[in-house]
């Protein structure tokens, strides 16, 4: 195959200014694969994503989760060309890459990223791309590996059970049209992928082969490749690696003969060569998703127009949440697909508004709401949901009926009858904001994530989206290069056009946002009483088989409730003019000119020499300081960053206030009070892409920190807003009301309630900080302090914080246009930090020591156990081994080498072979003063069992791996590959297998507002890292991996490394310092096992037509006490009493025994006495010592504050 067989399409993409150095191309390979090529000479890595137009909506009815299982098997089971199982994952790990995959209802996406390293003169990316591509040609669905991947899916599913987002999505399925595939459970679990196939004699290998053959062919695949290579080289890579994936014609003719297939294929290629090359209109005909799925759905909508039940009530102890879901289908409607895409985007902006006149503002003022989110969810092609999610207070939960009535009977009608000029102003401004936000967005610095998004977008209806919008992802009313951009001028014709758009949008709201089309999803305490008076078709409370939550469904009718609202003077309104839109971007014609310049620069980038370049790395500069103040700036390379945006952080340390749980809580309440008072004024800034954070110190000292990003003049306005409001709170006793303080306390309480209900891995990680960090207080201490926070004590604290001496750190990045103005304003209105240098006064003495970490004593082998959330059935452990002080470069270097060793062995051994849990992470962990290595696991097994398995792994690693190394093996297998990664600057972090290095940097601010993409983009992450290093006094500004001593490593011998391992890591070391944090589910293990058994048995009996009441079945399961044999006996007795024992039969009883036993063995084997032995597990089992015990006995810490009381 040659490049002449590739069809190229000329597209002038809409791209952000930050993409102007990149080159983009869309092309079609001879086999029908549509590919997007991105050449970026600044990339330090290369990435690829492949999306197949198939997903869980193609699952056979009897094998829920088959698509998900296929996704797992594709990458793990090998291919005919590369048959070694796990080869791909091993290569990714060895080269410090990342990989992932996900399955939705209609798409399956596989993607990976690798540093630009070379091996024997060949780019590693090219060789691994060949392995990756082979999976989509001739995969091996090795039956020996199927059970392992089913276990992984089961563990993944168990991790999802406690996720609020997953619960709501599944609840939407319960309310959906049962005739649509969306209504079916899709993730898969051990029941759907193992029990049912065994019961029905279904061969999974055969099902996987059939699924693959029917769906994995050229025309069903889209591809995105990104790297620093030229577009021609990347196109050649796409062609050489993926061009021989079979097209649909070859798949259809596969059973005929090789000759016939070959002839058909060559004929097809010849035809394509003669077809309209570079034909833009041909690209617009690509509608891969529509073409594939519309045939399957046959005009069936995801949600019925007249459902029996329109509401679901989910029982939960978490913070109550209410979702209003309005299904939108492009079937049986006068609105075009274009209309629906445009208006649904505008709907999100309108109903997510928090400024005065909005629903959010009104409900928050009533004390019913703590958060309002408006978004769309794509359920299937042509079917989306407009979702309004309200995070409620307890008072809000008690007023759900009123809230729903307000939305339907007051908010929506006001939008229909309001002066249409307000709506026109909103539409015009929002269109402009969309263009500004897109043009000024930062460059995507996670190439594989961008590729995964784009390979999926390529399957959209490109006639509707239009090819230029591929990077933008949505259509606007007026695009930036549209000649109609002049419609912003107020001519008569233009006003008529905008009036027409406004009326059409109002009709969109009327058509879809009404009571008949509403679905109500509620999560909270549903057992406290009926939430609605009028409910029809109410079901009994039952337990969902898959997600195990209790719920009931009903049809809720909401009559008009004018009595309650007749006296309300609140007026709902559309968002008004945005004060934060800078003059420089408020002219559409200027924006159009900017876009055209950017587009031309990118278009002709191919004519420039393709020379690899990356941004010049500059260190922050200390430009001004005195004893109580530092001002830092960071200038960015103008070729790679926009000079139109600023990021500003200022951190104020209260020098005269003692760190304590009370002080931390007062600061958190202060942050929330600032948010409550200013959020409605600042919300318009968020619409344009500004962000802000308010946080108390993550390390517990008395520090208040602000971080603000956006256009410079707006950033200055936000700084002034926060400072002025803080001054009023601190100095005016009449300013802060009791109601505002109450709301702030509720927000803090909800934050801790949400944190305590987080997954057990996060709880264990935070638990490590609580035990070891000096000022990181326990949840109990914080809640007690919150209970004692009253208006008088809070105002006293704020006054002291304001009046007492302070230390300011000001850090500015990007545009420095307002740097001096911000510095002066802080001095004059808050900190008075410049008076010290001007008046020559003495510096303020710091009365209290800075944050620090407990230095674990040698010979420590301790653990502490916390309870997890009561709805989470999983357990977890963080097994932390302290290895060095942060400034101990040699031991830090050896710890990094150990992290690399873990990246090669930990996941393959503990997760894939030993199968101790779904989440298995291991690598470097950095605390304030110390560093160490951690192993983190989430599993159904107990914490102590996980501790034992980790000890076995470390013993195996030492005795059977490292001790068998020769010096040659050590250098060839471990040291030289690691040095190679260092030399090629590609050890950014082993995130895939290690998790975050510095947990303190991962703590989210108390208040964080703005677009999630902007808050986590490359510039913001860099800003946080630099800001934290300044605060810690680590002013060399090196990344952690840059502190590795390469010269030391080059001279390292096996003997020296073994000495480190045997002293610091080995379980046989008397000097090792180790601490485990165990999170244990409050649910009793046998209770969980019994609940699982009941749900599995209930499903089995229903499938086979056995009638038994739920209450009777529950009693049978409870009496069996987790014993499958006793369960079968009790079932036999039950049906014998009813003279129906003949129905069971020996075969059915055996199947029950087999299915229940196998299901419970996977998760509860240690409790019920099962053994876990299979081929690959046995191979490693013989090397693992099941009786391994550390030389230092494990001891339990009496309480989380043990070290704090003893050492601090």
Curated annotation (Swiss-Prot):
The keyword Protease applies. GO terms for biological process: axial cellular bud site selection; cytogamy; peptide mating pheromone maturation involved in positive regulation of conjugation with cellular fusion; protein processing. It comes from the Eukaryota. It is found in: Bud neck. Keywords: Hydrolase, Metal-binding, Metalloprotease, Phosphoprotein, Protease, Zinc. Its EC number is 3.4.24.-. The active site is at residue 71. Present with 623 molecules/cell in log phase SD medium. Belongs to the peptidase M16 family. This is Putative protease AXL1. It comes from Saccharomyces cerevisiae (strain ATCC 204508 / S288c). The gene is AXL1.
